[in-house]
Amino acid sequence: MAPSLLTTPSQALALAPGAAASRVGGGGGGSARVSFPSGRVQRRGALGMRVRASVAIEKETPESEPPPTFLREDGSGAGSGSVRERFEAMIRRVQGEVCAALEEADGSGARFVEDVWSRPGGGGGISRVLQDGRVFEKAGVNVSVVYGVMPPDAYRAAKGEAGKNGAAADGPKAGPVPFFAAGISSVLHPKNPFAPTLHFNYRYFETDAPKDAPGAPRQWWFGGGTDLTPSYIIEEDVKHFHSVQKQACDKFDPSFYPRFKKWCDDYFYIKHRNERRGLGGIFFDDLNDYDQEMLLNFATECADSVVPAYIPIIERRKDTPFTEEHKAWQQLRRGRYVEFNLVYDRGTTFGLKTGGRIESILVSLPLTARWQYDHTPEEGTEERKLLDACINPKEWLDL
């Protein structure tokens, strides 16, 4: 079967389970053989599991156990000490650590159900989902490794080259460009209206030289982000969340937090509502204008910040008393979440159009949501306070 064919580099992770075009473990070398802290994941058998594919991507094959690595056995794969290898090891470690922290916070004995899949041409993924826990209505944490091919014009556009009829400005027409992409993507929907939803996603993208241009330079990008979507504003929680993001950013460049916060506010914008999806966080995309090792460490730091940014908030709010009115408002805000993901999120929409793995693509959606005709919260209410903050993003920290 032919490899994947994408239209732009930033869409590569749309082939990954649940990926969005926004959006990670120890930062250093090491083997791609990783351990999972939870060790209690329920695995779904390969039999009876239906998969979906189209001409855009290879059909995935269910696996009963995660392999030591999803990387191809070539010079840039397993055992090479490459960024690819370290990034895969990182996202798989983070997946295990986040799932373990969520299971502990849930406290019900509920466990993540795991699906493992691979593709014949290399790559694969691990989808983990917890539903109907005591604390979490639905929580998905997915990792994936994708190999494919993108059109040469997309490759040249990423390099800033101009040309006509598929030809580079200074050379003959080039062939399709092989690529590698890996990422972790997660959305966490708690039951309590006072406990916020969290989304995070971190990814790495890299090209190989086309067959007809073996000496062509390799291109690479990092992308990612972590953002918070509460139904009610509890400033202690929002400030804590943003302060953890800022601390992670400041370790590498003090300009990162203000720059990536604004990027986040701009990206998660529901145009037809004139609202942001939530109260932001950080977001960056196609980042390659810094040292590669520095950005690998930065993505790692951001992913390692997920648990300390989120779990303390969950512990404070998971047992907060609430009313039916609070729950109804949460469901309305969940509706906004659905609208953004299905209408605007580039990874979700691309995955739906190209026959991606549907269960993984839609794992970001909440288990329940609500749409109420012409609903507007009254002035002076806590609900209105949240809506105003989504319409007019604010600075949560003194910079």
Curated annotation (Swiss-Prot):
Catalytic activity line of the entry: coproporphyrinogen III + O2 + 2 H(+) = protoporphyrinogen IX + 2 CO2 + 2 H2O
Domain of life per record: Eukaryota
Record site: Important for dimerization: H272
Keyword field contains Transcription regulation: no
Entry GO MF terms: coproporphyrinogen oxidase activity; protein homodimerization activity
GO biological process terms held by the UniProt record: chlorophyll biosynthetic process; protoporphyrinogen IX biosynthetic process
Active site: H199 (proton donor)
Binding site for substrate: S185, N201, Y202, R203, G355, G356, R357, I358, E359, S360
Segment annotated as transit peptide: 1-52
InterPro entries assigned: Coprogen_oxidase_aer (IPR001260), Coprogen_oxidase_aer_sf (IPR036406), Coprogen_oxidase_CS (IPR018375)
UniProt pathway: Porphyrin-containing compound metabolism; protoporphyrin-IX biosynthesis; protoporphyrinogen-IX from coproporphyrinogen-III (O2 route): step 1/1
UniProt-listed Enzyme Commission number(s): 1.3.3.3
Protein's name according to its UniProt entry: Oxygen-dependent coproporphyrinogen-III oxidase, chloroplastic
